[in-house]
Amino acid sequence: MAAECGSGNCDAWAARDPSGILSPYKFNRREVQSEDVSLRITHCGVCYADVIWTRNMFNDSIYPLVPGHEIAGVVTEVGADVKGFKVGDHVGVGVYVNSCQDCENCNSSLENHCSKCVVTYNSVDSDGTVTKGGYSSHILVHQRYCFKIPADYPLSKAAPLLCAGITVYTPMIRHNMNQPGKSLGVIGLGGLGHMAVKFGKAFGLKVTVFSTSESKREEAINLLGADNFVISSDENQMESLKSSLHFIIDTASGDHQFDPYLSLLKVGGVMVLLSFPSEIKVHPENLNLAARSLAGSVTGGTKDIQEMINFCAANNVYPDIEMIKIDYVNEALQRLINRDVRFRFVIDIENSFK
């Protein structure tokens, strides 16, 4: 292997440098505190954020770095003051594991917008330790950031809900995109985009998928049940849809034009950006003259997360996943870079650390 494995009470895979190559690693998790929930991780989704931080793309990576923030597992221990969780419960942990718990955002269940929010890996927690994520055998979190998963909902499918799912669900609820009969455009058909289609159909929307790749048509229509598929570079197709959509969810990575999509919105329509292009350029008339809105969003608060999990369980909404073992994770990350996944890798943690 590329590095020493180390010692500690938790098995994991970690990146040691900006090459992003992961290899076996051991470290110590803290002891269970009064409001902690300890869980044995069974599954962890693979998010593009794992590529970004293992490779130090934002120049802030802290090595050794254990990625993973789409975590599902089984409770093994709870602190003395924990309420609502017990040993054996199925639970999930998402993008963040701490916040100040006392600011306006925290008091409004918008912990993801707390200025002291601590993310699940590569972040300095309140005790000064660096957080390490779900590519590991177990994790401890304060009960506030732990979420119940119904016993009959597969943990392998639950894992991607904790990032891909909530990143889409929160803006859809915030902007009232759950109105049956209305129309939704989804730009991009990756991990986030496919969840936008699934939520859209579950909400009773008419869903149109936009892609630059004709190869996505069959996935969009036949696999995911979208109502329409449009090649976004085809001016005639785009022109035919002007002023036809109530909502657009933009999951496309990289830089792209916004005006062609904004012109597809009806009067008062809303387009929500979930990615991070280097810049946004729009003509004001595309917004002002039709009272359209361009909004942004990132993950969701604790109330939304539990609500989303419950909604998925009640409405049979399941991410489409490809299960892998931890020793395949380097190949999986490269395939993710190459956009070669349908639609989310999930690491079978419980059968990888034996």
Swiss-Prot record:
Gene3D superfamilies: Medium-chain alcohol dehydrogenases, catalytic domain, NAD(P)-binding Rossmann-like Domain. InterPro entries: ADH-like_C, ADH-like_N, ADH_Zn_CS, CAD-like, D-isomer_DH_CS1, GroES-like_sf, NAD(P)-bd_dom_sf, PKS_ER. Its cofactor is Zn(2+). NADP(+) binds at residues 167, 188-193, 211-216, 251, 297-299. Pathway: Aromatic compound metabolism; phenylpropanoid biosynthesis. It catalyses: (E)-cinnamyl alcohol + NADP(+) = (E)-cinnamaldehyde + NADPH + H(+); (E)-coniferol + NADP(+) = (E)-coniferaldehyde + NADPH + H(+); (E)-sinapyl alcohol + NADP(+) = (E)-sinapaldehyde + NADPH + H(+); (E)-4-coumaroyl alcohol + NADP(+) = (E)-4-coumaraldehyde + NADPH + H(+). Binds 2 Zn(2+) ions per subunit. One of its GO terms (molecular function) is oxidoreductase activity, acting on the CH-OH group of donors, NAD or NADP as acceptor. Keywords: Lignin biosynthesis, Metal-binding, NADP, Oxidoreductase, Zinc. One of its GO terms (biological process) is lignin biosynthetic process. Its EC number is 1.1.1.195. SMART domains: PKS_ER. Pfam families: ADH_N (PF08240), ADH_zinc_N (PF00107). It is an enzyme of class 1 (oxidoreductase). Zn(2+) 1 binds at C47, H69, E70, C163. SUPFAM superfamilies: GroES-like (SSF50129), NAD(P)-binding Rossmann-fold domains (SSF51735). Zn(2+) 2 binds at C100, C103, C106, C114. PANTHER family: ALDEHYDE REDUCTASE. Belongs to the zinc-containing alcohol dehydrogenase family. Involved in lignin biosynthesis. Catalyzes the final step specific for the production of lignin monomers. Catalyzes the NADPH-dependent reduction of coniferaldehyde, 5-hydroxyconiferaldehyde, sinapaldehyde, 4-coumaraldehyde and caffeyl aldehyde to their respective alcohols. Homodimer. This is Putative cinnamyl alcohol dehydrogenase 4. It comes from Oryza sativa subsp. japonica (Rice). The gene is CAD4.
